[in-house]
């Protein structure tokens, strides 16, 4: 099943929508409209098809009024909005959710869509530790490894 018809000029592969059961990433410059696109099109379309949405906001940018203006149903029956910034927290949350989800009988399992806005803003424990110590040199390999394991 696919949802959220996307303009084919973005990518011909999305002409039929975003496929369920797959990881889809939207990349672009800051301010390009990725959050608007994900919330206004993908989340709304998923909800219209009865899909429960878990929206993980790492930027604290997706407030309820903005989502409602995009016609996203923010009621707890349709949307679980979480604010977190650590990659480890996101991974643990998804893992815990999936354990509980798999424990349900097949006929009771709702379709679920996870949206993470934004991968680029997530932090590793080392990022926080270095920031607290005033060490801003960074380590380019740490974050990609953590994201791959996510």
Regions found by a protein language model. Give the residues of each.
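The Walker A/P-loop phosphate-binding site
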Residues: 1-77, 89-99
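Conserved phosphate-coordination/catalytic loops
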Residues: 4, 84, 88, 145
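Residue-level recognition of the N-termini of beta-strands and the immediately preceding loop/turn
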Residues: 22, 79, 110-112
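Short, ordered loop/turn segments at secondary-structure junctions
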Residues: 58-60, 84-85, 118-119
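Conserved P-loop NTPase mechanochemical-coupling segment
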Residues: 74-85, 136
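Post-transit mature-domain signature of plant chloroplast proteins, especially small thylakoid membrane
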Residues: 80-91, 125
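P-loop NTPase motor core
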Residues: 93-150
């Amino acid at each position: 099943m696919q949802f959220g018809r996307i303009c084919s000029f973005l990518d011909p592969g999305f002409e039929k929508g975003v496929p369920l059961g797959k990881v889809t990433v939207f990349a672009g410059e800051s301010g390009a409209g990725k959050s608007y696109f994900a919330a206004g099109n993908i989340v709304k379309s998923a909800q219209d098809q009865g899909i429960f949405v878990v929206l993980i906001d790492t930027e604290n940018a997706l407030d309820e009024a903005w989502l409602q203006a995009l016609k996203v149903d923010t009621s707890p029956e349709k949307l679980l909005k979480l604010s977190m910034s650590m990659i480890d927290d996101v991974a643990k949350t998804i893992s815990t959710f999936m354990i509980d989800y798999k424990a349900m009988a097949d006929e009771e399992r709702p379709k679920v869509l996870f949206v993470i806005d934004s991968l680029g803003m997530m932090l590793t424990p080392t990022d926080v530790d270095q920031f607290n110590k005033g060490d801003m040199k960074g380590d380019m390999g740490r974050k990609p490894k953590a994201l791959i394991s996510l």
